[in-house]
Every structure is written in structure tokens, then in C-alpha cells.
Amino acid sequence: MGVSNRLAWGCPTKEHLLPHFLEHLGNNHLDIGVGTGFYLTHVPESSLISLMDLNEASLNAASTRAGESKIKHKISHDVFDPYPAALHGQFDSISMFYLLHCLPGNISTKSCVIRNAAQALTDDGTLYGATILGDGVVHNSFGQKLMRIYNQKGIFSNTKDSEEGLTHILSEHFENVKTKVQGTVVMFSASGKNSIQPQHVLA
């Protein structure tokens, strides 16, 4: 991750992504799309962390790396589906680091992912993260090669993802939206969630 962030995407982890992760971290936090669990190794011991991923192996690996004592819940769930009612209004912060560019479809089809996450936030909670852009940025040769391979294999679906498109879907569900592009990565935060009509699902 560190090599590609620095050399392919122009957004070094320790200089940009990790500070962004820690800046918005709340006491009761949900990390969606857990990856390797790298960011979780840096959270304070006092933090309550819950994990969400469709892949149970990823949940277990990230939990082990972060330290089981920090992990409150491990939730296997499809982010395109509404969350169980028990999760609504529960979290001070929710992170999505390198999740959105891996989800199928264009940026507008990912709006429901933002909506579902917003339901799980407290009224003053913050949704934040980072995603690799395909549109409106200039990729270097290494980045172009990875973009081509990953999109062809279905690992990424982000050739048309833009900062403007991301801002739009965040603004559909939040009053306060901030974005910052570093290299070909956009870091974002969103708070002041709009009123959302609940969708009823089985817990």
C-alpha cells in the first residue's frame, strides 16, 4: 500500500492519509472496507472500533492486526444494502478508505453507500475517507498501468470517478462537505447529515 500510494497515486500514506484518518476519528468508530487494518493500528487504546466488510477473512485479519481488545463489533455486510436498525445513529465517525473506487458502478450509483453509512452516524458524526480518482486528475505512467489493470480485472471501478461527482453524492446526504485532492487521491469529510427516512431491514 505504501509503495503504490507514494509512487502511483502521489498520496503518501504517513504524510497525508494517516493524518486524515486520525483527524476525524471519534470515540466510537466504524471502519468500512477494512483492507489490511493498517490505520487501525494507530488508533488510541481508548477508542471503540467496529469493523464492516463483506469479506469475513478481511474482518478477522484486520481485527487481529489492530488488536482484538480494541474491536467492539465485526460486521459482515454489503454496503449497498441498508444497515440493520441496531446500527442506526450509533457511531461518532465512519471511515471509508479506498472503498469507493473498488465498488462496482459509476460514482452516482455509489450514492446509496453514502446514504446507508449516514444512517449509522450520530447527528453530529462525521463520515470521511479517501478514494482514487479516474477523471479530472493526471495519472503518471505507473498509476495509468495500475488503473488499466485494476479496472480490467474489476478490482477498481473508477475510470469516471471525479472530485465533483464525489462532492455531489456526499452533498445529497450531508450539509458540510470538504474535499482535498492530493496526487490522484481525493480525501473527504462530511458532517451535518440530512434527515434520512429509515429503511426497514431485519436485524
Functional labels for PLM-detected ranges:
Residues 7-27, 38:
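Conserved alpha-helix/loop element of class I SAM-dependent methyltransferases that forms part
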Residues 28-84:
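Class I SAM-dependent methyltransferase SAM/SAH-binding core
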Residues 95-98:
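A conserved beta-strand element that flanks and buttresses the S-adenosyl-L-methionine
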Residues 103-116:
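A short, conserved alpha-helix within the catalytic core of class I
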Residues 128-179:
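C-terminal alpha-helical "lid/dimerization" subdomain adjacent to the S-adenosyl-L-methionine
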Residues 173-203:
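Core SAM-dependent methyltransferase catalytic element
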